[in-house]
Amino acid sequence: MRIVFMGTPGFAEVILRALVENKNNHIEVVGLFTQMDKPFGRKKELKAPETKTYILENHLNIPIFQPQSLKEPEVQILKDLKPDFIVVVAYGKILPKEVLTIAPCINAHASLLPKYRGASPIHEMILNDDRIYGISTMLMDLELDSGDILESASFLREDYLDLDALSLKLAHMGADLLFSTLKNFSSITRKPQDHMQATFCKKITKADGLVGFKDAKSLFLKSLAFKSWPEIFLENSLKLLEVGLVENEKSHKEGEILEIDEKGVLVGCLKGSVRVAWLQAVGKKPLKAKDYLNGRRLKIGGILA
């Protein structure tokens, strides 16, 4: 079984790795299509996608393609690879009709479709405090995440997971699901999506990390969803790191400092309170919350803003 893999970030790399390192000799990854290297950090040095890095670091004999668009000559390149399936995981591009007709294009999407179509389904699961997390495989069509569902897998949340932990868990689940979908493709009954039930999620931006001390539960969930990027920060750009939800009922002044100890600072919200372990000012290293407050001469009863 010849597979062309299309994917870019770490989530896709976990699934690509599983396909490449599988012990089933019937699966062969014959090509990687991924996004172009992009400037990263203050020095704007080019950074390769995680999927590309995995192939290069492991000296794998898998050709890598990073086209700006999926037109000619890329369509012919795809045809020449003679894939039995094209597997798409967080690629970042919509596939044109010319690609969709080369081979069945199977997308692993990190939600229980038709819920959370779009770029940030895992963020949305966390932000909406979902109790059930899941992933779907679907047969791609010309619209965004609207194709027939092939299979899905899910689990009941037992504890809160941040973006990194949930992404990793769903990626491993997605790899297992893809193996099943590829193996049983010819016998799977496709399930058309109920488009009336579809919900959509947008691309995350830096501005999404801006928070205030209004609702403790919402602030806590944002800290989980935006842990890797953009993190969460106040209007003065002070980052709140390692945030825990203490309670979500009592009413306090926004940003009121309720307690200070070695575990961090307990901060009141209009609804509830959170404990913040570390604080980081712009251009500075993270500090224990207690040390940061001492440096700013902020005490119990003061306002963190």
Curated annotation (Swiss-Prot):
Similarity comment text for this entry: Belongs to the Fmt family.
Annotated function: Attaches a formyl group to the free amino group of methionyl-tRNA(fMet). The formyl group appears to play a dual role in the initiator identity of N-formylmethionyl-tRNA by promoting its recognition by IF2 and preventing the misappropriation of this tRNA by the elongation apparatus.
The organism's place on the tree of life at top rank: Bacteria
GO cellular component, one term: cytosol
Annotated protein name in UniProt: Methionyl-tRNA formyltransferase
E.C. code: 2.1.2.9
HAMAP family, sorted: Formyl_trans
Keywords: Protein biosynthesis, Transferase
One GO MF term: methionyl-tRNA formyltransferase activity
Keyword check for Transferase: yes
Catalytic activities: L-methionyl-tRNA(fMet) + (6R)-10-formyltetrahydrofolate = N-formyl-L-methionyl-tRNA(fMet) + (6S)-5,6,7,8-tetrahydrofolate + H(+)
Transmembrane segments: none
Residues holding (6S)-5,6,7,8-tetrahydrofolate: 111-114
